[in-house]
Every structure is written in C-alpha cells, then in structure tokens.
Curated annotation (Swiss-Prot):
UniProt family annotation: Belongs to the SfsA family.
Origin superkingdom: Bacteria
Listed transmembrane segments: none
GO molecular function: DNA binding
Pfam families attached to this UniProt entry: SfsA, SfsA_N
Name of the protein: Sugar fermentation stimulation protein homolog
Gene source species: Prochlorococcus marinus (strain MIT 9301)
UniProt cross-references to InterPro entries, sorted A to Z: SfsA, SfsA_C, SfsA_N
Length: 246
C-alpha cells in the first residue's frame, strides 16, 4: 500500500547543524549556505536529533514570516540500518488526518461520515477544542457523533511507535475528556505516525507512565484508537495503512 495523500513542492535538502531554543534549527544547505529554520515540534524529538543528519525544509514567501524556512523532515536509520525519513512538523498532522478522513480510509472503523468540522469546543467547560468533530451519514447504523483527537508520533523502539515521548499534561487531559464523552458519543484517538518503519503502536509508558495508564483506562471504557502510518518523501506523503496496538 503506497497511496499518495498529499503532494507539495519539492523540499530543500540540507544537513542539521544544531537545534536550539526548542523552535529553531541551523541547517547547512547543499550550496553551503547556512539558514535558520523554524521547528514546529518543540518536544524532545526522542531518537531523532543527531547533528549531521540529513534534513528537508520548506520555504515560504509570506512577508509575515520572521523565518522563511520550516524544518519538515529528518533522516534516521531503522533497525536494518536503512534510511527512513521522519516528518517532524507537528502542524502537518491534522492536515494529513483530515485527508485520510476525506478519502474514506477510516470508514471501516468509524463508519461513513456526513460532515467534518475542525477545532470544535467540547468538554464540561467547553474550554477544550477537539481536533475533528464528525457527524455520521444517515445510513450509518451508529448514529453517535464522533470526536477525534490527533497526536503526532515520531518516537519508535524497534518497530513499535510510541506516544508520548515526554510527560504531557495536555495529552493526559485529552484522554480524560475523551473518556467522559463515552458512551453518548464515539471517542477516537488517532496517532499520526510520521515514519514508515512502525509496525505497531503502544503508549510511551517510559516517558509518561500516567499517560499510559489513562490510555488503557480510556481504551477499556470504549475509546477507539487508530494508529495511522505515513511515508514521507521529498515532494509527497504516502499512506501506509493502520497499524495494530502492541
């Protein structure tokens, strides 16, 4: 399975010099020029950061941007010592998952969809926002509305993708709120695995034990978990299918 999900202008290749202040990275281009790129992923990026690694960046012509370059991908080695490109722009995850929903690639799990809305307020105080709020088609036997929370996933151990890679209070809160929606609504956690070498998904207990416990509690309560895998290229992203839980 290697379906193209998103196409874009070819990215610029370079080499990582260093990442600093969490949201900045100095990158040496093939021309020899050194540029500073914005890093949307402010987490530890466990298992990814290595000075001298090959990277890919995009460029924006918007005059509103302080930095025209955005760090999009990094190249790492898998278990077989083969190159794997990993998508590290966390802002891209929702765009990818929306494409997957629109292409009906999740229908077998969540049913056929009538409408998709983004960033809809939910929870007891309505102060949280769900990534996607879906309504089912009238022909769908399950009439419950669907709440989808998306998590960008880059960390891997062997062939198991793991989330989170650090303690995430926000992620813990999301699991609690998803659990509270059950059974009146359908709660779905989608893991956007931005690398092709993952065969399974599991919660990152080592990084955040409480998140792992909350994940299993929510799963037992009826939360649906869908680990979606993608392969990243210089000018497009491909769908690699849904991976099982470990």
């Amino acid at each position: 399975m290697n379906d193209r999900i998103i196409d874009f202008d070819p990215l610029i290749e370079g080499v990582l010099i260093k990442r600093y202040k969490r949201y900045l990275a100095d990158i040496a281009l093939e021309s020899g020029e050194v540029v500073t790129a914005h890093c949307a992923n402010t987490g530890p990026m466990k298992g990814l950061l290595r000075e001298g690694a090959k990277v890919r960046i995009s460029v924006s012509t918007s005059p509103k941007r302080k930095l025209p370059f955005t760090w999009e991908q990094i190249c790492v080695l898998d278990e077989k010592n083969e190159e794997v490109w990993v998508g590290i722009n966390t802002l891209f995850a929702n765009k990818l998952i929306k494409k997957v929903i629109e292409k009906n690639l999740l229908d077998e799990i969540i049913g056929e969809i009538e409408t998709i809305k983004s960033e809809v307020p939910y929870g007891k105080d309505k102060k949280s926002r769900i990534d996607f709020f879906l309504t089912p088609k009238s022909s769908n036997p399950d009439k419950r509305n669907i709440y989808i929370e998306v998590k960008n996933t880059t960390w891997i151990r062997g062939n198991v993708a793991l989330f989170p890679d650090t303690v995430t209070k926000r992620g813990q809160k999301h699991l609690i709120e998803l659990k509270e929606l059950i059974p009146e609504s359908k709660s779905v956690l989608v893991l956007c695995i931005t690398r092709k070498d993952a065969c399974f998904f599991a919660p990152g207990d080592e990084a955040d034990p409480l998140y792992g416990n909350l994940f299993r509690e929510s799963l037992s309560a009826g939360m649906i978990t869908i680990p979606c895998s993608f392969e990243f290229h210089k000018d497009h992203i491909s769908w690699r299918g849904i991976k099982p839980l470990k």
